[in-house]
Amino acid sequence: MQAKAVARTVRIAPRKARLVIDLIRGKEVGERFAILRHTPKAASPIIEKVLKSAVANAEHNYDMDVNNLVISQAYVDEGPTLKRFRPRAMGRASAINKRTSHITIVVSEKKEG
């Protein structure tokens, strides 16, 4: 059984969020919270919130044991890009892309044996 949590259109670049997601993929849930709390990246609190939501979904919706959970999938997809312009010299403007992310975390119970 798997429980899933998704944060959509989060205002952080996918490239930066993937750096943090790569640290926690495949580890036990308790260990991941410690890693996220001590990682000085802007994506850490956002990913921690999504992980807490996935654990809560597993506990309340599927009656899974919280101490026996493992992250089976964790990935960041690209969301819609907000296009902005920065004024430049001589009446020109240059584009600024404010990127967003869709963060997905899937937890499942450890296999016995």
UniProtKB/Swiss-Prot annotation:
Record keywords, A-Z: Ribonucleoprotein, Ribosomal protein, RNA-binding, rRNA-binding
InterPro entries attached to this UniProt entry: Ribosomal_uL22, Ribosomal_uL22_bac/chlpt-type, Ribosomal_uL22_bac/org-type, Ribosomal_uL22_CS, Ribosomal_uL22_sf
Key word Membrane present: no
Entries under Pfam families matching the protein: Ribosomal_L22
The keyword Ribosomal protein is annotated on this UniProt entry: yes
A GO biological process held by the record: translation
GO CC field: cytosolic large ribosomal subunit
Domain of life the protein comes from: Bacteria
Gene Ontology molecular-function annotations: rRNA binding; structural constituent of ribosome
Similarity remark: Belongs to the universal ribosomal protein uL22 family.
Subunit structure: Part of the 50S ribosomal subunit.
HAMAP family: Ribosomal_uL22_B
Function: This protein binds specifically to 23S rRNA; its binding is stimulated by other ribosomal proteins, e.g. L4, L17, and L20. It is important during the early stages of 50S assembly. It makes multiple contacts with different domains of the 23S rRNA in the assembled 50S subunit and ribosome.
PANTHER family: CHLOROPLAST 50S RIBOSOMAL PROTEIN L22-RELATED (PTHR13501), LARGE RIBOSOMAL SUBUNIT PROTEIN UL22M (PTHR13501:SF8)
Protein name (Swiss-Prot/TrEMBL): Large ribosomal subunit protein uL22
Species assigned in the record: Geobacillus stearothermophilus (Bacillus stearothermophilus)
